[in-house]
Amino acid sequence: MDGVIVYCLNALVKHGEEINHIKNDFMIKPCCEKVKNVHIGGQSKNNTVIADLPYMDNAVSDVCNSLYKKNVSRISRFANLIKIDDDDKTPTGVYNYFKPKDAIPVIISIGKDRDVCELLISSDKACACIELNSYKVAILPMDVSFFTKGNASLIILLFDFSIDAAPLLRSVTDNNVIISRHQRLHDELPSSNWFKFYISIKSDYCSILYMVVDGSVMHAIADNRTYANISKNILDNTTINDECRCCYFEPQIRILDRDEMLNGSSCDMNRHCIMMNLPDVGEFGSSMLGKYEPDMIKIALSVAGIWKVL
């Protein structure tokens, strides 16, 4: 057809960084189809975000266990984040197309203290209206739709009834470093001849690495160059798949080599703090409460350097 021109992307753009941005960042997020099919209409903006919230998940499961005498678990590690602006008070519809049987929506209101919205909840049997102020959480019954009125930002999590989770570990070897984002890994590891650690990374106005290593607590702050490096990469979640078990079957643990982790970072104690270095990430200065065990710290620090594998 006249007027149609097809170019090779590399020949047309000729800028490597932008070509990589197009290839890597413009993609459908690999999350469960049930989350993708939450229909959001009306005057709202929405996004799909990773929401690893183990304490929230446990709290919701405790509430549901008291109501239904059954435990629940997250359908997906992703969540729907929506921003609602209803200046004319017109209800904005939010509901799940498929209404999966036994799905329990949990709605978290976030945003400004003055933001207020109403949830108009309906099912085949009844209707209800509740007010949801900022930082309130609503746990809805199964098989319902809801509409909103007002101004608010909402996080929508989907839960369903769960059976006891399969063990994460089948066997262990002395030279293994085993990591998982699931806290129950600590309960499955042997209590002798092993040490346990916990890591979290946050990057807002500064990058902070929080580590608990065999009971010792470290609070490490990145220098400016390291902060810039972490900030650039922390938003890249295109390589993270869901583990919903209906669409994605991602492994829930990673097994690493102890010697590689020992050689993957360094740390030195001085008069003021512990200086930590991750060759591919940068440098941190850390306070410490507890016993200084350099080998344990280096293993945990090296794991922090490859945090995106989970």
UniProtKB/Swiss-Prot annotation:
Protein name, UniProt field: Protein OPG181
Induction remark: Expressed in the early phase of the viral replicative cycle.
Keywords: Early protein
Pfam families: Pox_A51 (PF04948)
Family of the protein in this entry: Belongs to the orthopoxvirus OPG181 family.
